[in-house]
Amino acid sequence: GADLLLPSVLYGRHPHPGDVAVLDRAVREFPPKPDAPAATAWSHWHMISTLQRFAPPPPGVTGTTGPGTAAGAGAGAGMTGTYAEPDAAWLENAPWQSFTHQLSVLAPLAVPAAPSAVQRAAADRTVDLARGFVRAVRRRDWLQAAGAGRWLAAIGGEPATLGLERGLDFVELMGGHDPRVTLHVRAARLMAEARAR
């Protein structure tokens, strides 16, 4: 997914052209099916927006492509226009448990300077997300806890009583054998450090 370019996003460096090519190929060859879950559509949208962030369309090319068009379905770094954001209304009224689960699945979207409807939903429900983080830790669901922690670090505004930094340390200690957990925890730390500067 888009986390392939995460080091470039977090450190503000140009990605390796080979990494861009791999992500571009994934976007083009594996578009979501029309009946794909919302999380799949959002993941695909984020891969496209990440590619465009580092490899924008050629100068002078404009236009918009939607998810129903051929370009929208498989458009990457060389595409023209933009891929429309999928619907995120399903997040607004989701119970906090489901909300946290869905956001942890969408943790790759939790990056700085990448606004989206999912990010706005997360920012509007930081208390629910903090609750979900604690619940995931108590249930020993380290991947969900790491994903929720990454969102909290990306958007800020978590309750001070949460102790996110120590919570992330614990999540990494207990679940760090899973590379996805380690990735989310380290991304969260980098974003929290950048916010503190």
Task: Kindly label every feature range from the protein language model.
Residues 1-139, 143-151, 155-197:
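Polar/charged low-complexity regulatory segments
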